[in-house]
Every structure is written in C-alpha cells, then in structure tokens.
Curated annotation (Swiss-Prot):
Residues 250-472 form the Lon N-terminal domain. CDD domains: RING-HC_LONFs_rpt2. PROSITE patterns: LON_N, ZF_RING_1, ZF_RING_2. One of its GO terms (cellular component) is cytosol. One of its GO terms (molecular function) is zinc ion binding. Transmembrane segments: none annotated. The keyword Metal-binding applies. It holds the Pfam family zf-C3HC4_2. This is LON peptidase N-terminal domain and RING finger protein C14F5.10c. A zinc finger (RING-type) spans 169-207. SUPFAM superfamilies: PUA domain-like, RING/U-box. Keywords: Metal-binding, Zinc, Zinc-finger.
Amino acid sequence: MRKERPGVLFNKIRSYFICPGCNCLPDWPVTLPCGGTVCRKCFRNAYSSESSGKVSPSRCCFYNHKKPHYSVETEVKDVIISKVVELIKTTEFQISQQSLVPLELKEEICHDDCLSSSPPCTSALTEITLLPPTFHNLIPSSSSYETAVAEFLHMEDLLQENVSRELECQICFGMLYDPVVSPCGHTFCGPCLMQALTQSPQCPTCRFGLPSPVVLEHAKSHSITTFLRDFYPDNWLERQKSWEEEKEQESWLPLFISMLAYPRMPTFLHIFELRYHIMIKKCLETSKRFCIAMPLRARSDGHNEHRELRNARGQRLFCSEYGTILEIIQVEPLIDGRSLVEARGSYCVRIIDFRADGLFPRVKIEKHYDTPLRATPLQFPEPEYLLMYGNLSNEELVERIDAFYMNARRTYVHWVVPLIDIKMEARQSIADLSYKITNLLPISELEKTRILQVDNPTDRLVLVLIWLTQLQESWWYRVGSACTIA
C-alpha cells in the first residue's frame, strides 16, 4: 500500500484541472488560444462586453499573459478535460459514500484511540487535515479506519489510472505529448496533428475544418501538459527525444529535381535513372517522403530570374528555393525497367541547406505552413497588383475567378478552363483552390513556383487572379468578345 497520506494524491490531481478564476472544477471547461483552461462562467465574465454581451477579445486571461487573445470567439467545451473533471467528481462522490461519521465525534474517537496509542492521535489528525476540502467535516470510524484508508488510497490510484487513460491521442493512441487543443474542442499530440493536417485540413475526430498549423501551435493545453510532465516524466522525456530525432531526420530529405508539385494533390512520376531508383528505395525503407523542386532554366536573354542555391561548402544546386514534400503511396515497377510512382503532396517547404555529395542531393528543409497574416506589398511577388486586388475578400476573389472562366467557356479559349467547379472547390477548401487552378493554368512552370512562396490562402487567390489578368491581357482578343480575323 502507498505510504502517502489519503487525500494528497486526490488534491494533487484535482489541482491541475481547477479553473484559476473561481478555483473550482469547471462544469464546462473552455480552453483559450494560449492553452489555459477556464470554466464557461469565468470565460464569459472575462471576455464578454458588459453592454452587448458579446465576446470581446480585448482582455488577457487568468494566466497573466501580456497579450490579449484576439482569436477568442467561441466557448467550445474542451472534450478531454471535461471527461477528466467528470472522473474527479465521480471519485469524489464515491469516497463520500464510505462509512464515515461526522466531525463532532472526532474527540470521542480520538479518546478511544489514545487509550492504546502513543503519541496520542497525532497521525490520525494529520491525515484528516489532508483530506480533500469536501471531506473535512468527516472522519473514518475508529473500528474501520485502516480499511477506509486502504479504500481511499485505492480510489486515488484508480483515479490516476483512469485520468491517464483519458489523456491518449486519438491519432497515435499513445499518451499525449505536447497536446494541442483544436477549435472544435478535441486534443491531439502536437506532432500528430501537424502531420494529419498535411493530409486533410479537418479534425481527425469530427471532421471540423481546422485553421493553419501556425495558429494551432499556440493552443497547447497548459493543464494536460503540466499533469503529464509531473506524473509521467520518463514517458514525456522519451516522447520528446523520439520526436526530436524524427524532426531532425525529417529536416534532411532526398531531393528530386524534376517538376512542380502541390500540397494535398496527387503526383505521378516515371523513374528511370538508377540513382533515383535507389532514392525511392531508401525512401520506402524510412519515412516514404522526399522533396521535389522545379529545376532552373535560363531565359531566352541568357539570364536566370531565380538564382541557384549555394551552401557553405561552395556547392551549387540549380533548383527553385521552394518545393513540396511528397509522400509515396505506391510504386509499380514496369517491364522496361522504369518505375511508376504514385505520390501525394504533403506541405510546402523552403530549402535552407543542402548536401550534394552522393548519388542524389539531400536538403535541409523548413516547413512553410499557411498563416492568417496577409503579405505586405514588398513581400508579394507582384506588389503593384497586390495593391489593386489586396483588399478583396475571399468571396469577391472567387467570384472574379469564376467570372473569368465562365466567360472563357463561351469563347474559343475554352481549352484553358480547368475541369473543376470553382465555387464548389472554394466551399470545400479555400486553401487548396489556388493550387488546383494553378496546376491547370497555361503559364510557365517556373512562374508557377511563386504560388509555393505565398503562405496565406487569400494572397494565393490574389496571385491566381493576377495571372488570369495577365493571361487575358496577353491574348490578341478579349474574353467575352467576338473573334475577328483581319
């Protein structure tokens, strides 16, 4: 049996999940964008405007953070913490149902115990003071004291076991590491969720649309993190070490200089060179991932708009600075020695270093996630056009792009129209719409690499509209007008 006094473990577990505003277990826990958790009542008091009753993100939270939470808009229940709170309350109720007697009998019980104990009653009184606040008015009867204490300790151990079982990631089914709370209230390991978002921008549990990983990285649950670090430090350090090794391994990937690929879109490759056969084989043995980038080609005037990459060792790499991580789905060997590789884009990357010593180059990458921040004109590939279209909303941009293609379908240039429904694709994923349109645009592939540099979905739509405008201006007739031949 544990040597710890009854009530200590219960109070310790309970302390991790209480609301800092009212110092009580939250009936409806709300996790803030900073990772702190409060009850719904305290949330409304802190973030609601007194005049309108609407949520106002102008105040800071109870965790003494200096910056206000500009993204606080809803009071979605934190699913995992609500389950943990329910377990704590259930255990609290079960303990209260033990055969206990009122505090008024304390002196009588202590007197009976003192007849055969020395020193008199000291340990019993100390244990009583350490019981949870709910039980301070109760004391075990002297006849069944040891049994009551044993039951109490067993319930505490069972509570810890049940809480740890709830704190499991629904992606890797392991204990949570670096837990991130999604806007829909579900919690996952940070690395697992970031990995899942490369396949689909939806919650793995409820399919709710999720924001950019850059936003989610800040929503790490403070309560769950501190609980797991304190109760399971060895497991936490093991997961941390494993993730750092995996991250270091992922940061250096084989590079295939071939073509342009896009995130969350299928890509098919014909592999016939021996060195790339070896590269694909090595990828299949490890993470099944590699980086693909567009090769540089000189323009007709002999100059190159994109300069080659150089590293500290003086080596040069003739490819674009931005590429895409492809994940191999399957490899089909053909009878003529080639291999047909089916892959899918995961996310955009920026090449920050490379090694060109072996059969194929290996590159160190930096993930290029979407952000909610809009680009400034100086950061945008076409600054003068950004000033023209930069103030348009997503809906207005989609309307203009759709109008262009609707007009094109009625002319002799219907062949430039992508075989997709613009508005339907926008409803499904506004972040991927620009990639799907760019993939089918009749412009230079090297020019298309600009889309990988833009990390805001709205700015990407602006860039697509710029390309459509330039494309229309370069034609010898206007879309929507009659074709005349002199």
